[in-house]
Amino acid sequence: MKEERSKIKSDILLRVRLLYVLFILAGLTVFARLVWVQLFSAEVAYNADRLASRIFTEETIPAQRGSILSRGGAPLATSIFRYQAAFDFASPGLDSLKTFREQSDSLAKLLAAFFRDKSAAEYSRKFREEHARRYRLVNGRDTTYLRSEGWFSRLMDRLRGEEFATRRIYDTIRDHTPVNIFPREVDYAEWQTLRRYPLLNWNMGMVYRLVERDQRVYPQGELARRTIGLTGDKGNYGLEEAYREELAGRDGKALRQRIARGFYGRVAGGGHEDPEDGYDVVTTLDLDLQDVADKALRRQLEAQNAIWGTTIVMEVHTGEILAMANLGRAGTEGAFYERENYALGRSMEPGSTFKLATMLTLLDDADMSPQTAYDTHNGDPVTVGPAKNIRDSHRGDHVIDFRRAVASSSNVYFAKAIWERYGITGKKQEYSDFLHEKLRLGQTVGLERLGERAPSITTDWKVPDPGVMLVKMSYGYRVRLAPIQMITFYNAIANGGKMISPVLVRELRRGDRVEERFESRTLASSICSRSALREVQRCLELVCTEGTASLYFRDTARLRVAAKTGTAQITDARSREGRYYLGSMIAYFPADNPRYTVLTTIETRAQAGKAYYGGPLAGPVVKRMVDYIYNRNRDWYGRVERHGPRRHPDRIKGGDIAQIRRVAD
């Protein structure tokens, strides 16, 4: 008996031990599997990542793009938020059809009155159709349920034989795709009104997602649009492109959790990083001056039926660009608009405005005396070296000196002077070296970031016609410069021989804090000797008093202006259709203490009754800019006190000065 009991006990212990072993093995297997899943299984990790990526995603929080401002702080380009309400018509908050219809009908009336694009009935119909399309009841079936919950109520129902009731239930099909309900995006002020409307005020729950978009707007319209620029599908140019990184700022990021299709909520924490808005770019542009330049240039282009034109106003001592207008025609008969940045991107033969470089070369490098005279043959064509048919555009001059040649813009004079000193003597290389190294005309002026085209002035004289090239270079052909390079060159003469780079951006700001300030760079401390500087300054004044610009500046009684005009015939594929010209005028003023330099360049076609020479073509625009700047700077002319000493005009534009003084008394 004892043996049987002992045997039974041993069997039981054996079985228990076996069970222990089995449980331990099972536990070890489960543990090993967990370790494998957690640490080594690529498939499980992949599936877990996929599941997490469907629920949690990293959202980029876009930084607000910085603004581009005028020198006075007026916005030229800025970003504003636009809003759209994307509705989830399958949201459980809208399951009550009666409440939804009441609220949506009220919203429809308010939206119809706000946007005035369609009737309230159309809005209401749209809401109901979208709700019916995205929220559907299917597979209807009856189900039985207890009518009451408490035991006493159930007892009474049983006594009445009404313990159970039948209800029809449905499965639902929900499409959570967002639907935009506004006919257009709205701004912040409009959204503050709309958010108080039914449904939009969350009175039926979170049934929509507010979509924000950062939109770029240009408050000044087309004014300086080519200089301001653009980024995106329509092109990348101007300040918008040049300062893309500074304006863009740094985007932030946040973790968001999927709530329904198209709807997400941000998760607190989760590596959240706030965005850093972009810098504001403060330009040197004067908004009033830019407006005057645009209107004056547009008026002249329309009056002369021209092709395109550009006007630049530059401050002499700082190099700041106060205005830069670029207008081109859309087609042959279209209106003018900011089509291309001609000031920076058009490198063309400048014509007689290049004679300033020839003047400095003759005076400084060749040591020519201003009294040197040449016969210009009264406007008849002459041969100078290997170049034939060199002629002046006017008659009346025979033997003239240096100053008269500048005032009348004589091609023959400068062609002969350059050929005699650099052609006959075989010093062509010295001529081009002086233009490049001393006058710095072969280099850009520092606006490459904005699309400045490099100039073209030869340094290689191994060409088929080096003599002809030398002669033509003397009066502005066979060289190519952009208008910005020409005005920088003339500004150096106004600035006492010191050439500085033009500046279009003053500073980068974040709020009221200046992060970086920009100033002009010295390109050449002196491009000429003092004697040559005084001589060319005197000659440029003569252009305005008795030369090709005298029509516009001869009678400026209180303001002395120095200028040079230029005309170049354009030779390209269009030459068979007619004659095309580039007319220019570059001026600085006041001549005795220069503060501003102005350039206008216009391309046109020779037409009956229309101008194509530089003076009459560009002069009216330059004249308008000079007058406007002078009239708005009251510190240039003194005030006459009511009870002060008598004052008489020193000069008058016309008439008898004795009678003028008598009237003044």
Language-model-derived ranges and their functions:
Residues 1-335, 429-438, 552-556, 571-577, ...:
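Periplasmic/cell-envelope proteins involved in peptidoglycan metabolism and beta-lactam response
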Residues 3, 77, 258-272, 276, ...:
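Beta-lactam-recognizing serine transpeptidase/beta-lactamase-like catalytic domain environment
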